[in-house]
């Protein structure tokens, strides 16, 4: 059933803690456990983790070199990679960011910039980026998470309406993890082109993958932003990156 929690937070934390305890001699596994636990602890407090997640999948060499002593390693990567679903179901957060990345984003946008976040979800980015208007029509409610709980004040607007209202007043528009159904993202990009938007459209998503519409990726002029990808690295099977889009 949509919105039903299948990945209980407490159960997942216990699983990761058990993996850590059983693999104390495997430094790589312990480090990954610590990253996951620190991320969950921070988000429970409505704070951002201080450091980014690194790739959670265990290497084939590590698994097979230690398989006799640690047969459970065959299942550990899958358990680690459940993190995003845990975040979605328990926090309503699809895009997992960290404080280092937010600092990079703030530097890129500028200390005095005015910003708009569309399809903001629970507005984690807006809550941590200065002078940012958070907007979302909350039509994702019930899709793995029943209860929107924004981190900051949010104006209930769909993406196109929000862009029409604010594009001439902001320097940066941020769109993170837009859904791959519909073509609202493409409508937004068309509107900005037609109205000669002079600011930056910053998109966080997986090209031709889990986020955004096919039409958007087919028509977007994309530039990877090194500054915004140094502390934003794919950690699971979804290769999301930060793009400047024209």
Regions inferred by a protein language model and the residue ranges of each:
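N-terminal accessory regions of S-adenosyl-L-methionine
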Residues: 1-98
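S-adenosyl-L-methionine
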Residues: 135-169
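Conserved SAM-binding loop of SAM-dependent methyltransferases across substrates and taxa
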Residues: 122-132
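A short SAM/SAH-binding and catalytic strip from SAM-dependent methyltransferases
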Residues: 170-185
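C-terminal substrate-binding/active-site "lid" region of AdoMet-derived donor-dependent transferases
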Residues: 182-246
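A short, well-structured juxtamembrane/interface segment
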Residues: 91-111
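Flexible, charged surface loops at secondary-structure boundaries
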Residues: 107-113, 164-171, 194-196
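Conserved class I S-adenosyl-L-methionine
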Residues: 112-121
């Amino acid at each position: 059933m949509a919105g039903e929690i299948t990945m209980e937070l407490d159960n997942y934390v216990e699983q990761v803690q058990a993996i850590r305890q059983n693999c104390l001699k495997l430094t790589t596994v312990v480090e990954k456990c610590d990253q996951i636990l620190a991320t969950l602890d921070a988000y429970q407090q409505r704070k951002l983790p201080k450091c980014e997640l690194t790739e959670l999948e265990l290497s084939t060499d590590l698994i097979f070199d230690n398989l006799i002593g640690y047969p459970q390693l065959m299942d550990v990567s899958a358990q680690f990679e459940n993190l995003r679903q845990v975040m979605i179901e328990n926090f309503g957060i699809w895009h997992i960011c960290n404080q280092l990345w937010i600092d990079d984003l703030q530097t890129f946008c500028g200390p005095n910039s005015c910003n708009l976040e569309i399809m903001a979800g629970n507005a984690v980015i807006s809550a941590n980026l200065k002078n940012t208007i958070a907007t979302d029509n909350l039509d994702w409610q019930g899709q793995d998470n029943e209860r929107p709980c924004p981190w900051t004040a949010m104006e209930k607007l769909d993406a196109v309406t929000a862009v029409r209202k604010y594009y001439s007043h902001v320097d940066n528009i941020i769109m993170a993890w837009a859904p791959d159904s519909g073509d609202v993202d493409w409508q937004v990009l068309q509107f900005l082109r037609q109205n000669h938007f002079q600011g930056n459209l910053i998109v966080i998503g997986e090209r031709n993958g889990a986020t955004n519409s096919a039409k958007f990726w087919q028509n977007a002029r994309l530039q990877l932003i090194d500054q915004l990808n140094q502390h934003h690295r794919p950690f699971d099977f979804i290769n999301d990156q930060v793009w400047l889009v024209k």
